[in-house]
Amino acid sequence: MVKETKLYEVLNVDVTASQAELKKAYRKLALKYHPDKNPNAGDKFKEISRAYEILADEEKRATYDRFGEEGLQGGGADGGMSADDLFASFFGGGMFGGGMPRGPRKGKDLVHTIKVTLEDLYRGKTTKLALQKKVICPKCSGRGGKEGSVKSCASCNGSGVKFITRAMGPMIQRMQMTCPDCNGAGETIRDEDRCKECDGAKVISQRKILTVHVEKGMHNGQKIVFKEEGEQAPGIIPGDVIFVIDQKEHPRFKRSGDHLFYEAHVDLLTALAGGQIVVEHLDDRWLTIPIIPGECIRPNELKVLPGQGMLSQRHHQPGNLYIRFHVDFPEPNFATPEQLALLEKALPPRKIESAPKNAHTEECVLATVDPTEKVRIDNNVDPTTATSMDEDEDEEGGHPGVQCAQQ
């Protein structure tokens, strides 16, 4: 007597149904409720497929008959093939014109990084890289042995796995393990029939040289793909070999998209009276850039050299080179009073600021900020709090105070 009949009811069969009757019932219901034919019956189709997968397996059926669905918990009943895979294996695929039979699966991609400089990305670069990979054995054509010598493993019926059932209290646990007779290969070859080149492994290791072209204008993180140059194995499509560009940080230029950014320092005289800056570009050119007298370059001002950026892979025009100017002021007391008087005549008149009439005024003197305090302020640390903490540390530090004498 069975504990539960739900799965039998799903297939509309008796609990004593034979495998042929189960198969016939599943075929009829699967065709009726397949989502390609009946789009609103997806859940029903999955329920039918699950019921058939369990009852078609003698071990699972015996466990279900004895303990019900509770006995299948942890036993892999829900870890089998999907409803679509079960349907495809049963009918061969291509039903209802909806799906084509599945082709061979694709192997794993091999991903490597290729380190480049910004100069490489500006000028382009070609490099050769050696790759060690598995390829189909040319001597046995991937069979692993003499033709006709490879047999399906009788112990696991060619699946490469075996199932063991354990009783754990009132529960039955069904576990999967690699078949020890074929080491998971699903096939066996007699030692005398093994291929001498690959020793039955079907593949051998081979060194391959790939020529990698880093095109002008490529970006950090961009991928260079070699289709199906990955490792080979019988029955699969080789994966791709993918090189990911890893750009080293540049000491002079920053890149954003197709644009370059450069930080230029000019002295105050050049900023006011004109002069010239020189920029070493990424292709060994030196750009001479005049600063027009009276142009008055301001601190942190941004200028642009159109078309001097990176070559664009998407547009015909290259990007721009943006130059951020930093004006370096002279040291204190750099000029005599007479020179300052001449400077005052040359510059626009100073703006005179004054307090409101009859306001209380107090004259103050500017002082230089302590370098340590400046760092704290730049890092948004309250200098008052920081100073207080330093004083506390000094008090706790190794300067003993007055101690009481023991009586």
From Swiss-Prot:
Pfam families for the chain: DnaJ (PF00226), DnaJ_C (PF01556), DnaJ_CXXCXGXG (PF00684)
Keyword set, alphabetical order: Chaperone, Cytoplasm, Lipoprotein, Metal-binding, Methylation, Nucleus, Prenylation, Protein transport, Repeat, Transport, Zinc, Zinc-finger
Protein source organism: Schizosaccharomyces pombe (strain 972 / ATCC 24843) (Fission yeast)
Disulphide-bonded residues: none
Gene Ontology cellular component list: cytoplasm; cytosol; nucleolar peripheral inclusion body; nucleus; protein aggregate center
Keyword Chloroplast tagged: no
Region spans: Disordered: 375-407
Residue spans, zinc finger CR-type: 124-207
Name of the protein in its database record: Mitochondrial protein import protein mas5
Sequence positions bearing Cysteine methyl ester: C404
Site entry (Involved in dimerization), positions: F329
Domain called J: residue spans: 6-68
A single MF term (Gene Ontology): Hsp70 protein binding
Biological processes per GO annotation: cellular response to heat; cytoplasm protein quality control; protein aggregate center assembly; protein refolding; protein transport
Locations listed in the record: Cytoplasm; Nucleus
Assembly and oligomerization: Homodimer.
InterPro entries the UniProt entry points to: DnaJ, DnaJ_C, DnaJ_domain, DnaJ_domain_CS, DNJA1/2-like, HSP40/DnaJ_pept-bd, HSP_DnaJ_Cys-rich_dom, HSP_DnaJ_Cys-rich_dom_sf
CXXCXGXG motif repeats: 137-144, 153-160, 179-186, 195-202
Binding site for substrate: L110, L129, A130, L131, I209, L210, V241, I242, F243
Propeptide residue intervals: 405-407
HAMAP family (alphabetical): DnaJ
